[in-house]
Amino acid sequence: WESEKMLAMAIYIKLQSRGTPVKSIINNQNRATLAPFLAKGKKFFEQRRGLLDMSCKHCHEDNPGNMARSNVLSMAMPNGFPTYRLKWQKPGSIHRRFSGCNKNVRAKPYKRGSEEYTNLEFYLMQRSAGLKWETPAVRN
């Protein structure tokens, strides 16, 4: 998930779509198949965790634009990932960002590529349908 080659390939592929809208892959034919994964991703997004007893929703839905320490909270839209993060000084995956968020709320992070993070990524991608691809974005 974090090898230079994998990130470079993901950036290259998504760069081809830069400026075009993110499209939902859910349609009438696959809705029943994909609905459980979408529901699990949404549940994870809204579920409290860690010593701070916070969910993704508390920061990214209830407080986007506000500051958490020295960072401006985003709306949790993954259309810029993999992204070059100034803190990392190199590109990183959205699963790396998920791990960082879990650490910030004092929760044990899941492994990159885990079912939990994959379902969360799927849910967030569906929420971002209609936004334009920005990969690779730059974040603080």
Language model features: what each stretch is:
Residues W1-A39, G65, P82-P109, Y117, ...:
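Post-cleavage N-terminal segment of exported redox proteins
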Residues L38-R48:
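Short, intrinsically disordered, charge-biased short linear motifs at domain edges
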Residues E46-M75, N104, K108, R127-T135:
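Periplasmic/extracellular electron-transfer cofactor-ligation site
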Residues V72-N79, K90:
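Cell-wall glycan
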